[in-house]
Swiss-Prot record:
Belongs to the PRA-CH family. It comes from Gluconobacter oxydans (strain 621H) (Gluconobacter suboxydans). This is Phosphoribosyl-AMP cyclohydrolase. Homodimer. InterPro entries: PRA-CH, PRib_AMP_CycHydrolase_dom, PRib_AMP_CycHydrolase_sf. Its EC number is 3.5.4.19. Its cofactor is Mg(2+); Zn(2+). One of its GO terms (molecular function) is phosphoribosyl-AMP cyclohydrolase activity. Catalyzes the hydrolysis of the adenine ring of phosphoribosyl-AMP. It holds the Pfam family PRA-CH. Mg(2+) binds at D106, D108, D110. Binds 1 Mg(2+) ion per subunit. Binds 1 zinc ion per subunit. Pathway: Amino-acid biosynthesis; L-histidine biosynthesis; L-histidine from 5-phospho-alpha-D-ribose 1-diphosphate: step 3/9.
Amino acid sequence: MQWTAAFGSLARLVSRGDAFVTYVPPAPSIVDDIIAQVKFDANGLISALAQAPDGVVLMLAWMNADALRETLLTGRVCYWSRSRQKLWRKGETSGQQQKLIEARLDCDMDAVLMIVDQTGVACHTGRRSCFYHGVTPDGLRDTSQPEISAEELYGR
């Protein structure tokens, strides 16, 4: 489909250290067709996984139809904040934006994987990834340290 970049090409670009593939948004009518095929849950949401081009999973969030539409049309990742009940444009307050490189829907059409160009860190704790609690035989262990403090990240 025209709305995704070729993953093989992306992998070659990343391995050479070249610039990322530029996301080319589909026409609004194609975005509407894609969204019509998505199976949103009873709350009108799908899970949205953000992954860096090197394969690191950055975060898991939620999207409603409006967030998915905005993301696909603009290439700037937008989520749905369940706690604030409003659109959450990643990096709006912190500057830690995500630019879409590629989007893929899963086989059930109820989850989206986004390969993103992450500015700064993805996690509100100041870490690159939100997935830093490693499970060990002795319990949980932090697998990474913050790259930036919350005070620096949010100016608090």
